Amino acid sequence: MAESQSQGADQAQDLNNELKARREKLVTLRENGIAFPNDFRRDSISDHLHAEFDAKENEELEELGIEVTVAGRMMTRRIMGKASFVTLQDVGGRIQLYVSRDDLAEGIYNEQFKKWDLGDILGARGKLFKTKTGELSIHCTELRLLTKALRPLPDKFHGLADQETRYRQRYLDLIANDDSRNTFRIRSNVMAAIRRFMVDNGFMEVETPMMQVIPGGASARPFITHHNALDIDMYLRIAPELYLKRLVVGGFERVFEINRNFRNEGVSPRHNPEFTMMELYMAYADYKDLIVLTENLFRTLTQDVLGSTTVVYGDQTFDFGKPFDKLTMREAICKYRPETNVADLDDLEKATAIALSLGIKIEKSWGLGRIVTEIFEETAESSLIQPTFITEYPAEVSPLARRNDQNSEITDRFEFFIGGREIGNGFSELNDAEDQAERFAQQVNAKDAGDDEAMFYDEDYVTALEHGLPPTAGLGIGIDRMVMLFTNSHTIRDVILFPAMRPQK
């Protein structure tokens, strides 16, 4: 213990000494009027250079005499007397610089370059060549310090201390971790590919309110804020659904939105209070059309973003080139709890007994539909590894979905699961204004009974339905969970740049 404390004290002292030395260098730069120049322009990015010139031999590069200008962060440096090698990192990756005293202006190498630190941001100009080991490099004829880093790179002092630091100081994680940078590149590519797919399928992108007087569109506890000028409480949206369907009433027959939702709930490997969803609504369609659209979306995204319809996640492999599996909720329960008699799931007393045997705490306000849903979540959800649609959700837990024509106790709704996680939710929309008003009233009763996730009564939305919502289907997909899948990430914090964190004391 004493030795460990001593090492920690030594490391802290080393860091303090380095911080002091770097600030002293900045003082000198300020005195010379070259602390933070802003007149350097680059014309090349590392990955573009590698893609175009890695295959060329050094003789060909010398003959071409290609001069490039680059800029980035100095990650490594090997000083060998009058010459040095530097690894420069930019948005595209890394490229090596060859720096020779005799090729730079007088005094640059010894008086400036050798005093710079790892983490400093440099600008360099020179000709491309290959080293004896065949590495594409830039033979520098100009080298400038563009930004002085006052703190060392994280790996110099034993890397990032823990996972929490990666999330709190994401900038350090992105500097030091190639995998993290790649994860967020993939995320950006996923968002762009979704938009292309939606536009190609005739959808219009729209934006709806993030602050709402009445939160709706999902069963969740909202965040509350206050609008000073209007002197009213408002809610950060939990879903855009009701506004998007108002647009369908207004005549926009295919709409979608990609944006953040906010739910005042706990943090877990699958949950962040602020998260990104894509919701779409299309008129003259039902939930079966959504199933086809969802399969096409995932097939297109994986091919466009990853170059293959096959995705490896942990020790599982998913093939999005083929149709998803399909089970009803009751079929899934019986499959993963074989001792279940399906008829018992239609009997309140027997379903209650099953739930209690599974350790489910039943609330007084729950009916049969909610109990069966809880049984499903407890027995089957985590076992749905391969892409699977679960259908026939009870009306009790689906206040916005259309009732099934053959059985009014269930709805024309599905959720789909991949890797044991819910990824999306879709259904034929309820467009019967009177039925919707009745279900809102039931939600109000549930809220009065203590269910703080029950929905509010939205009178204006009922009025919109009274003007006529065409037969419509709607789908919501969690973008964060989708990106987790595509990047083989096992916690949602790894795919959100700045996840929610408890403030440091």
From Swiss-Prot:
Its main location: cytoplasm. It is an enzyme of class 6 (ligase). InterPro entries: Aa-tRNA-synt_II, aa-tRNA-synth_II, aa-tRNA-synth_II/BPL/LPL, Lys-tRNA-ligase_II, Lys-tRNA-ligase_II_bac/euk, Lys-tRNA-ligase_II_N, Lys-tRNA-synth_II_C, NA-bd_OB-fold. Mg(2+) 1 binds at E415, E422. GO terms for molecular function: ATP binding; lysine-tRNA ligase activity; magnesium ion binding; tRNA binding. It catalyses: tRNA(Lys) + L-lysine + ATP = L-lysyl-tRNA(Lys) + AMP + diphosphate. PROSITE patterns: AA_TRNA_LIGASE_II. SUPFAM superfamilies: Class II aaRS and biotin synthetases, Nucleic acid-binding proteins. It is found in: Cytoplasm. Binds 3 Mg(2+) ions per subunit. Its cofactor is Mg(2+). Homodimer. Belongs to the class-II aminoacyl-tRNA synthetase family. This is Lysine--tRNA ligase.
